[in-house]
């Protein structure tokens, strides 16, 4: 009882001294605990995004002498794909990729380079992305995000049960898409878009919920899509599919200045951006050969068919411009200028 009385008295005195205000806990670092950030992702653990992110996380821990830890959560294990952007915007995740595959009206303007047939190669895509960096930075800042890097997934193709060789073959096909722009592409070319999170694509193909799925050919082996589809159709709908590494602004501001520098320097030390683009090219080249070894058939539509698809797809551009307004129009002008058009 005496112990309880003394404890009560001590708390009362403390409250009187502080004017009745609650005493704030000591900062995390003052308590001797490392700063922990969570980084969710959709890619499989063996995919190059996760390999490179793990290298970055290891470098942060090394350079901070254990004062900071970034935990990488692969394969949608922390949040499903559609939740990645909301999670980093509202601070549930301190750092996360903003995938062009899952842009919504929150950041739809970022997807200008993902418009159908805007680019046809990784090199073109990167050239334009570099020129658009200030635009991307500005758009993210409006949502309280700090842009750290611009990197990419390889070009987007179509996995399917039956070959899609001609524009006519698109008609009525139920195809998995991953956002507004990809849905517009499929709809414009005559297909029926079905939004399916990345982690559910295998099951959708296996159960034939869809006739095919739009994604990178590099997913054939790590996601085992070769088990549930027979063809990869090389329409080169986009030269790449951008991904931006973003930090929640409040989380960044709460980080001590020296740890901010550690994060920035670690990305440079592991050559994160360059490595991502290099790996995208390497994996794309390797995927085509490997998919054939796994029993898949590569379908290369005639140039005339791709030209027809490119012409028709301009309707999707107009739909995107209506949704993105003045910022979208400015982004498109910047992209076309960067590509010399």
Give, region by region, the residue ranges found by the protein language model.
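N-terminal secretory/targeting leader peptides
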Residues: 29-124, 132-341
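Short, low-complexity disordered leader/linker segments with a strong preference
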Residues: 1-36, 341
């Amino acid at each position: 009882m005496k112990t309880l009385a003394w404890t009560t008295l001590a708390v009362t005195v403390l409250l009187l001294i502080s004017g009745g205000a609650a005493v704030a806990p000591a900062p995390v670092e003052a308590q001797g605990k490392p700063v922990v950030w969570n980084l969710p992702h959709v890619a499989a653990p063996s995919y190059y995004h996760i390999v490179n992110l793990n290298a970055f996380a290891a470098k942060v821990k090394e350079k901070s002498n254990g004062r900071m830890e970034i935990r990488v959560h692969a394969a949608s294990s922390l949040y499903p794909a559609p939740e990645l952007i909301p999670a980093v915007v509202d601070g549930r995740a301190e750092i996360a990729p903003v995938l062009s595959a899952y842009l919504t009206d929150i950041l739809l303007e970022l997807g200008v380079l993902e418009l159908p047939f805007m680019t046809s190669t990784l090199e073109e895509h990167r050239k334009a992305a570099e020129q658009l960096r200030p635009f991307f930075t500005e758009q993210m800042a409006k949502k309280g995000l700090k842009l750290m890097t611009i990197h990419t997934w390889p070009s987007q193709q179509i996995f399917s049960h039956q070959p899609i060789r001609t524009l006519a073959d698109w008609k009525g096909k139920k195809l998995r898409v991953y956002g507004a722009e990809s849905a517009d592409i499929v709809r414009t070319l005559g297909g029926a878009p079905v939004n399916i999170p990345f982690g559910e694509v295998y099951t959708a193909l296996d159960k034939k919920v869809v006739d095919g799925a739009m994604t990178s050919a590099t997913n054939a082996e790590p996601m085992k899509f070769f088990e549930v589809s027979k063809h990869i159709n090389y329409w080169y709908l986009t030269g790449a599919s951008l991904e931006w590494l973003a930090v929640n602004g409040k989380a960044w501001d709460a980080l001590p200045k020296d740890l901010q520098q550690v994060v920035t320097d670690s990305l440079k030390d592991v050559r994160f951006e360059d490595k991502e683009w290099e790996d995208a090219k390497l994996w794309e080249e390797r995927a085509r050969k490997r998919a054939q070894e796994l029993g898949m058939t590569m379908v290369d539509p005639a140039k005339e068919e791709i030209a027809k698809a490119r012409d028709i797809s301009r309707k999707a551009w107009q739909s995107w411009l209506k949704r993105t307004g003045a910022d979208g129009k400015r982004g498109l002008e910047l992209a076309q200028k960067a590509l010399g058009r």
